[in-house]
């Protein structure tokens, strides 16, 4: 949710504070070994903001994602170093993105290759942008699997990109059930109801939520009034390997749920040792 319209962001922050009142418990444990993969995810997420072409760190880009109507942006590629096929989603940089961030009207998703339970609902601000690119993403990943059949799959993104990663993970898991899949959604807000979280959390593969200290975005839409639900495993860090912890459940007070922050705060712009927009593309 990187955006330069300060007054709108302050407004969202105030709304989110009014809507967020979680019940918290603390059970986090040290998880330094998780930091390198989350650091790499942050590098790729930062690269998505930079409009990289050709390469983004270890990923060779094969297709840019850019849907003008919905503002959806990112890239798809592969890493010979990691033997991964990668779907990387960009966070917010425009008014269109910001409108997606706050469009919490619940809708029933419908995507090719995905069978949703009838009670699953997700926010329109995620359903609409992902639906615009879903078929393109699946087609490109399918093409790359044909070229690199032994590669695993990954989805990565920060902020709005992290929220889109939440649905990308399900789309990839359902369309390619025989492929190993790991997704890292950084600084993401929850996107759907409890039925959605239960369904998404039941998919094959690994879904991680990576959050930075003093970031309030993961706490958005998690109240009795809106009450969207996260899924997956949360990791929390102040930017160093030594500070990285694995959180227990979705509302561990030693992690983002207990930091007292809501919506866009100063901690939102850093992630696992990377300041968003500053990492470049990693390689010339």
Predicted regions and their residues:
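Non-catalytic, mobile gating and regulatory segments of ester bond hydrolases
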Residues: 19-156, 160-284
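Fungal secretory targeting signals
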Residues: 1-23
């Amino acid at each position: 949710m990187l955006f330069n319209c300060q007054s709108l962001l302050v407004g969202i922050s105030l709304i989110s504070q009014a809507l967020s009142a979680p019940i918290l418990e603390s059970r986090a444990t040290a998880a330094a070994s998780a930091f390198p993969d989350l650091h790499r995810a942050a590098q790729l997420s930062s690269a998505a903001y930079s409009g990289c072409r050709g390469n983004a760190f270890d990923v060779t880009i094969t297709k840019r994602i850019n849907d003008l109507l919905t503002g959806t942006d990112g890239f798809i590629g592969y890493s010979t170093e990691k033997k991964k096929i990668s779907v990387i989603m960009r966070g917010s940089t425009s008014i269109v993105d910001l409108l997606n961030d706050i469009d919490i009207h619940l809708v029933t998703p419908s995507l090719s290759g995905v069978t949703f339970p009838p009670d699953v609902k997700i926010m329109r601000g995620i359903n609409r942008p992902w639906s615009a690119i879903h078929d393109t993403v699946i087609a490109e990943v399918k093409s790359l699997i044909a070229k690199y059949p032994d590669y695993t799959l990954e989805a990565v993104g920060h902020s709005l990109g992290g929220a889109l990663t939440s649905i990308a993970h399900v789309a990839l898991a359902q369309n390619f059930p025989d492929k190993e899949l790991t997704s890292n959604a950084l600084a993401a807000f929850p996107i759907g109801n409890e039925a959605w979280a239960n369904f998404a959390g039941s998919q094959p593969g690994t879904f991680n939520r990576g959050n930075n200290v003093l970031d309030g975005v993961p706490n958005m839409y998690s109240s009795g009034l809106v009450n969207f639900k996260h899924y997956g495993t949360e990791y929390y860090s102040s930017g160093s390997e030594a500070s990285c912890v694995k959180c227990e459940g979705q509302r561990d007070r030693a992690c983002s749920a207990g930091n007292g922050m809501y919506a866009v705060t100063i901690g939102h712009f850093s992630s696992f040792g990377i300041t968003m927009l500053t990492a470049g593309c990693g390689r010339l």
